[in-house]
């Protein structure tokens, strides 16, 4: 076992220290230049589209249509993104890599926004019908766009095991630690409650999943941001110092000489990817479920999800920690560091608040992570027996994760996440021309004053699409 752990650790070091960082930053920049930094230029359009998808009129109309709304799909991907990485992961990055790690998390979010746009637009282009819903993601665009079902199958296995099983164990482990610190609650009870609540949702289908995260995600995000804003306002005079610390430690001479710069970059990129998932190939599984009139609409909304996760939620945690006196404490790490930092700002009840917040963040991640596995189980086989076996395995891992920290399992999650990212990034490079063409089509229609509507025939060479044939609009079912 020790030998296996060493091998996995060595592979992870190579993957995360060299290959993945180079690919994430390099391809993120490539996509950014090819789309002319659309993730910045069209930020206002992203907000508008999200608002339209969340309107009461849209939500009422969506109940009678296929698929889920663009806002529900956004909440599904955000549910997976916004989890323990936002509270515990940021704390780990700061304690091990210093304040400079925050800058690299920001950077990977900004340039990763372009990668998120490309992969989510492709997921919409190649989505398939599934009864009165849609499904899709990397496995589907690998099969239909690259004609490589075998590659899609490999990706499906990786995401099902890593997100549905291992990452969900990570989430429940962090919740158990937070509740132990705040209430001294038996970890087995925490795991049982989480598994029970999750079972009610995952046996109800994609629309029940969408409704659940649509309720949880906005509430938990607003409350957490409000608390963070209170901390910032009450420490407003220290904000310039925090920014100074972040940028000095990101590029400082001390870090270069002492080797700390590498740790800051490595941890910032790694935790940034774990948190916002840009380019990893996970969020496209949620993006494909949306019923929209143009793939670019959901590409924009999923890009906004990356920014919401890292530039907003992760930054809240970073400022809570860096505005405290405990961020250099050697004996604090992970969720305990976040709890102690917030306690310094708002009093001892902060540990209770963080425990509840981490429960909501993590539970929403359990739901989102589960769905990623489900849609890929359907790609692989679609057997009800296999799907139910997967559901039971997910619930078992939630229970196991609450009571056990098995380092080799966490290392295996890092390995699978890295391989997933590499496979997905290579795939979207080869297919990106269709996302670029779809963006051109969208912008052209917007300039003509139209609400953009997409047809596959508008892009030369685009084949094997199921949901974008021109005759399909004859039924007048208007998407959101």
Each predicted region: which residue ranges?
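Transmembrane helix-loop junctions in multi-pass membrane proteins
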Residues: 2-4, 34-39, 85-90, 165-176, ...
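Extracellular loop-to-transmembrane helix junctions
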Residues: 9-49, 95-132, 308-314, 351, ...
